[in-house]
Every structure is written in structure tokens, then in C-alpha cells.
């Protein structure tokens, strides 16, 4: 099993969620996050004054999937989250040693 963390632009969340549902993903955790990478933030004009915005709003999607659909999920996220502009985000893939569904005690693939 693998855990996929995807940091994407907030306006792409619905597209990514729907596309992942089409490939069989039935659940995910979504968190509003802030961060910066190469784009380093930007300036905004507010009431006539310029302000530097160091951290940009992003959304973090976390899913745990069986090994055989990792590439499909990663490709789906890339295809639907990509705008071609700086700040599209990142995808991280981690090994998962064990998963337990608290309600039933099911483990591993049965728990995801």
C-alpha cells in the first residue's frame, strides 16, 4: 500500500476529487494548507497599499491506495491538477506499513 499526498491549487480540488472517484477512489482526507516553493509568494494591493504574501493557499489531498493503482492515481492527479503555471503543486508517494479501520478492525487493503 502507498499513501499519496498531493498539494494542489484550491480551485482544482473538485476536478481532482471527481477524477479520482472515476478511477475507484472512494475516500480521501483534504486539508487547507499554506506554503511556497519556487514561486515565493506574491504581492497584493489592499486599500492602495502593496503587501507581500509569503505563503500561498493550497489544498492537501491524502489518499491510501493498493500498490496496483498508485500510478493510475498519480497520473489522474497530474492530468486534472495541472495548469502549466508555477505553483501547480507536488505529489509525494510513501510506503504504508499497516492500515486499520477503527470501527471494524479490518486491516490493510480491506480497511482502505
Swiss-Prot record:
Keywords: Nucleotide-binding, Phosphoprotein, Transcription, Transcription regulation
InterPro entries tied to this protein: N-reg_PII (IPR002187), N-reg_PII-like_a/b (IPR011322), N-reg_PII/ATP_PRibTrfase_C (IPR015867), N-reg_PII_CS (IPR017918), N-reg_PII_urydylation_site (IPR002332)
UniProt superkingdom: Bacteria
PTM note: Uridylylated/deuridylylated by GlnD.
Keyword presence, Nucleotide-binding: yes
Cellular-component GO terms for this entry: cytosol
Key word Iron-sulfur present: no
PTM annotation (O-UMP-tyrosine): residues: 51
A Gene Ontology BP annotation from the UniProt entry: regulation of nitrogen utilization
An example Gene Ontology molecular-function term: identical protein binding
PANTHER family cross-referenced by the UniProt entry: NITROGEN REGULATORY PROTEIN P-II, NITROGEN REGULATORY PROTEIN P-II HOMOLOG
Self-association state and partner proteins as the record states: Homotrimer.
Protein role: P-II indirectly controls the transcription of the glutamine synthetase gene (glnA). P-II prevents NR-II-catalyzed conversion of NR-I to NR-I-phosphate, the transcriptional activator of GlnA. When P-II is uridylylated to P-II-UMP, these events are reversed. When the ratio of Gln to 2-ketoglutarate decreases, P-II is uridylylated to P-II-UMP, which causes the deadenylation of glutamine synthetase by GlnE, so activating the enzyme.
Record family assignment: Belongs to the P(II) protein family.
Protein's name according to its UniProt entry: Nitrogen regulatory protein P-II 1
Source organism: Escherichia coli (strain K12)
